Curated annotation (Swiss-Prot):
This is Large ribosomal subunit protein bL31. The keyword DNA-binding does not apply. One of its GO terms (biological process) is translation. Pfam families: Ribosomal_L31. Part of the 50S ribosomal subunit. GO terms for cellular component: ribonucleoprotein complex; ribosome. Belongs to the bacterial ribosomal protein bL31 family. Type A subfamily. The gene is rpmE. One of its GO terms (molecular function) is rRNA binding.
Amino acid sequence: MKAGIHPAYVDTTVVCGCGNTFQTRSTKESGHITVEVCSQCHPFYTGKQKILDTGGRVARFEARYGKRAGKKADAK
């Protein structure tokens, strides 16, 4: 490796909004990173993920426009 072209790699403390902290290594010189979510509070990792129901949108679309298109096709 060439000397002098690589950034310094320092021990870093990551602090989450939920209060969880952990140690990692980073090129950020301050040695401190603040994040909003981490693996301890993110819904995907905690199992509290909300699954969106897109079927309701499709049914609503068909109720609005599907019936009109069906009437036009039947009228011909």
